[in-house]
């Protein structure tokens, strides 16, 4: 039994989904969404705020401000509310409507930028507004998830050791890439402690991570429109890029087995399934993937037929149904 005092005390989950049983994919999926934030981002949010309080960056009278496409904004809303710290989230139109409502319900102020850059991304506009807010408002503190070492340290100190403990014979770990915090923290831990474990980064088509070509993206979470400081090719053994259409197909396929998971999770599972089919036809590898989020916030996007049709066209989901 767990008795907690604050919402961010509920952090660690030992829940793994055996996808071989449901989808025929030899993969264990670590569920990071079973906390009050509903995503892995609660780890980074808790770590960054704790670090800021320790080093004096955050003090009485501070207001936190951060750029987020959604999940980190919710996580920081929870951490800030638990500590009675005001929080302003700068997001964009791609943020799921349910996520915006959730942040506001938690007491956060949400500001939505509306001018994308040439690639259709809002990241540069979000960051510019954060800088402007900090410049013109005394006490505003930007935690800067993109460069704050407490982001990746959360996974170096917690996420990766938990996986290593549960899977002493682990061969390969699949990690989605956004800011690179989860990836770099896990990669550094296993490089130092279990160098035989292969780290496979899973990114979305259209992301510039690892020097790949920029393109349009519709799902918040994974991917980046500009290079992320934590992400470099030397961290990983391989990189898989997944089209968003495939990620949506996988989300819907999982949902038909009762697992309503987020777009980031659909991307990672789709990429892991493709990599394992190519590199482990004998199904001998002990594989784990990190599920970053749950699917309730994607009801109006990934799981909405009209949105999917308008965004991607016909996904031929009936073909996916026949495979699982």
Model-found features: residue ranges?
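PLP-dependent amino-acid enzyme catalytic core
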Residues: 1-324
């Amino acid at each position: 039994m767990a008795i907690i005092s604050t919402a961010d005390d509920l952090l660690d989950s030992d829940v793994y989904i055996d996808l071989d049983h449901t989808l025929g994919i030899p993969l264990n999926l670590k569920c990071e969404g079973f906390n009050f934030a509903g995503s892995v981002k609660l780890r980074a949010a808790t770590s960054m705020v704790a670090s800021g309080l320790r080093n004096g960056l955050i003090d009485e009278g501070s207001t936190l401000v951060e750029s987020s496409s959604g999940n980190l904004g919710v996580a920081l809303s929870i951490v800030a509310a638990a500590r009675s710290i005001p929080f302003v989230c700068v997001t964009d139109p791609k943020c799921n409507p349910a996520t915006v409502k959730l942040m506001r319900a938690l007491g956060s102020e949400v500001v939505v930028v509306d001018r994308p850059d040439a690639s259709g991304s809002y990241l540069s506009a979000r960051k510019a507004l954060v800088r402007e807010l900090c410049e013109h408002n005394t006490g505003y503190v930007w935690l800067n998830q993109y460069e704050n070492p407490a982001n990746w340290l959360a996974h170096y100190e917690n996420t990766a050791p938990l996986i290593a403990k549960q899977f002493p014979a682990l061969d390969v770990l699949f990690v989605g890439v956004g800011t690179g915090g989860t990836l770099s923290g896990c990669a550094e831990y296993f490089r130092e402690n279990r160098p035989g474990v292969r780290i496979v980064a899973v990114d979305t088509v259209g992301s510039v991570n690892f020097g790949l070509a920029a393109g349009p993206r519709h799902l918040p979470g994974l991917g980046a429109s500009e290079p992320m400081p934590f992400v470099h090719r030397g961290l990983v053994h391989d990189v898989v890029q997944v089209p968003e259409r495939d990620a949506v197909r996988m989300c819907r396929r999982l949902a038909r087995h009762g697992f309503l998971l987020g777009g980031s999770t659909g991307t990672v599972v789709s990429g892991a399934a493709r990599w394992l089919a190519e590199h482990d036809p004998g199904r001998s590898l002990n594989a784990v993937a990190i599920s970053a989020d749950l699917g309730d916030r994607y009801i109006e996007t990934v799981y909405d037929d009209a949105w999917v049709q308008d965004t991607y066209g016909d996904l031929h989901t009936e073909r996916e149904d026949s495979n699982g």
